[in-house]
Structures are given as structure tokens and as C-alpha cells.
């Protein structure tokens, strides 16, 4: 097929296999050597036939809650590991390091409605995790508007097609694309970050994703997945070249979207409509809150409100 396609369209990029929401590698029947990984066998086949260069991108869907549902708040703790586990499985089973990979469709659909801020936290954590893992891009599903205000559509509309309110994931996207990363059409440098904010069970309650933006500012996206408590944290940047830590200095912009900026009020249901659900309204439904922090070295504390996405943006000093 690649040969025939390229005969007609020489520059057509070819890739796949568009895995659908798989939580791990995809197995097939075992071959004579006992190898069951479809990914491994697929790349071995291309390599043995001298066609690996025809394969220019690896694609997959990501729906961590599609089969099992994620009604419990604690399911948020799993998302970075969900991402890292499946991508590492593909790398371990033959995904060539030079082939870019893309999440071409995905969401937290089983709990992605307007009635909770949880899907916003999931989206921010997911995007930070998958880009840190090396993805070439990620694509949101779905943008189609919905007339059911409690459903998973990106924007709810009325009968005349007018937007009636803003969903948590819409507002989270505004924070990610307008506050964390800017300008979105220029290259950013993404650095791995770690957090030691954990609960008694060992769950990481706060995750962090650090960008060096084209304008020279450091922009740290933090997701406080603690539903009940705020946290105050210090932030340090490891300067490997100088062999020391550096810290925010001067004015740091702080943008927050979370439980205080989005509150859902369900409509009362008549007894005859017990199965309906979903109807209601959000008040407030954004915008994200803004403030500044005066940073002065290692001891500076940054407040992270409960159940929130936080962007801290500023410059680091030489202290």
C-alpha cells in the first residue's frame, strides 16, 4: 500500500496504527518465538521488508475511563502513570525512537461532564504527562457542542446555537494554551519535574510540569488533586550546568482555575425523571483568578488551592 500511495502522492506521510484506548501494549497470537506483542511484530515486519522508513508517525487514542468508568475522585491520581505505562510499553516493544507519536483522540469521557471540576484537572495532568513523555502532539475529543449542559461536550449551547456557559475542560484549555504555554506557535522547552506532596497512602497529590517559554519566562503548571485541602509549596530549579538550585525571583504571576472558580448547581429533578440527570448550571463558570507573588529565594511559599490547576510564571534569579 505504501508503494502504491507514494507512487501517486510521493510526500504523503504514512503512519498508524491508531490504537483505540488501550491501557497497555496490544497482544496478538504468539509467533514461533513466543512474541505476542502486536507492536513488536508490526515493526519487525516493516524492518524485515525494508519498509520501516515508510512509517513516519505512531498514533493512538486515550480513554482511560471508557471501560471502567472513573466515578471516584482518586482515579485522578492514576493518570500520569497511565500515560507513562502505555508509552513505555510501546517503546519497549519496538517503537523506534526517531518515530514521533501522537495521541489523536482522547478524553476522560466517563466523568467528563460539566458537573464537576475533576475533568479539568484530568485534562491538565494528562497533557502535562503526555508531553513530558515525548509526544509530538495531542488532540482533544470532542469539540462538538452539546445541548445537554451536563454532558461531555466542549461547550454547551441552547436551541439557537448560542453558548450558554463554559465547561471545566474549556476553561482548563484556556489556562493551558493562554497562560502556561505562549505563544503556542513557537517552540517551548519542557523539563521533567517532580513533587513530594503525597497523602498517607503514597498518592502524589500535586503534579508539576515546567516550561521554559520563548519569552524567557519559566512557566510551571501545577495540578493540586487534593479535593479537600490547599497546599503551600516551595519550587526549585535544578541547574545541572552550575551544579546548584535556582529559584523564582521578583514578581511571579499566578493563575488559578479550580473548585473556587467553577461550581455546579444541579437542577431539581421531578420524580418521573430520575434517569434524566445532567441538567443544571455553573455559577461561577470562570474566569480563572489572577494574582502575583513576590518571590525571594528558596523559602518562598506558593499557595495551591484545593482541586485546582495553577500556573506560576516568572523569571528565576542567580541566588
Tell where the protein language model's regions lie, with residue ranges.
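Short, charged beta-turn/beta-strand-edge "cap" motif at the junction between a beta-strand
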Residues: 316-319
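Histidine- and/or cysteine-centered catalytic micro-motif in compact active-site loops
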Residues: 63, 106, 143-144, 223-226, ...
Amino acid at each position: 500500500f505504501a508503494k502504491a500511495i507514494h507512487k501517486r502522492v510521493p510526500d504523503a506521510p504514512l503512519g498508524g496504527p491508531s490504537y483505540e484506548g488501550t491501557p497497555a501494549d496490544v497482544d496478538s497470537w504468539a509467533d514461533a518465538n513466543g512474541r505476542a506483542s502486536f507492536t513488536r511484530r508490526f515493526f519487525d515486519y516493516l524492518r524485515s521488508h525494508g519498509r520501516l522508513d515508510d512509517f513516519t508517525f505512531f498514533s493512538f487514542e486515550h480513554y482511560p475511563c471508557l471501560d471502567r468508568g472513573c466515578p471516584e475522585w482518586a482515579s485522578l491520581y492514576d493518570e500520569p502513570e497511565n500515560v507513562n505505562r502505555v508509552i513505555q510499553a510501546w517503546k519497549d516493544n519496538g517503537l523506534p525512537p526517531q518515530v514521533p507519536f501522537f495521541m489523536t483522540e482522547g478524553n476522560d469521557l466517563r466523568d467528563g461532564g460539566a458537573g464537576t471540576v475533576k475533568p479539568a484537572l484530568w485534562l491538565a495532568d494528562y497533557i502535562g504527562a503526555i508531553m513530558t513523555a515525548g509526544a509530538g502532539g495531542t488532540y482533544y475529543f470532542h469539540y462538538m457542542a452539546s445541548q445537554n449542559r451536563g454532558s461531555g461536550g466542549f461547550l454547551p449551547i441552547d436551541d439557537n446555537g448560542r453558548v450558554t456557559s463554559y465547561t471545566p475542560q474549556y476553561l482548563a484549555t484556556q489556562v493551558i494554551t493562554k497562560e502556561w504555554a505562549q505563544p503556542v506557535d513557537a517552540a517551548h522547552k519542557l523539563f521533567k519535574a517532580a513533587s513530594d506532596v503525597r497523602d498517607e497512602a503514597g498518592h502524589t497529590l500535586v503534579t508539576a510540569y515546567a516550561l521554559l517559554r520563548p519569552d524567557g519566562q519559566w512557566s510551571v503548571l501545577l495540578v493540586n488533586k487534593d479535593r479537600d485541602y490547599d497546599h503551600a509549596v516551595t519550587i526549585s530549579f535544578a541547574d545541572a550546568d552550575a551544579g546548584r538550585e535556582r529559584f523564582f525571583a521578583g514578581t511571579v504571576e499566578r493563575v488559578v482555575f479550580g473548585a473556587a472558580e467553577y461550581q455546579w448547581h444541579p437542577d431539581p429533578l421531578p420524580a418521573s425523571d430520575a434517569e434524566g440527570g445532567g441538567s443544571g448550571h455553573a455559577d461561577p463558570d470562570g474566569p480563572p483568578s489572577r494574582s502575583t507573588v513576590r518571590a525571594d529565594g528558596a523559602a518562598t511559599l506558593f499557595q495551591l488551592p484545593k482541586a485546582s490547576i495553577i500556573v506560576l510564571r516568572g523569571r528565576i534569579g542567580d541566588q
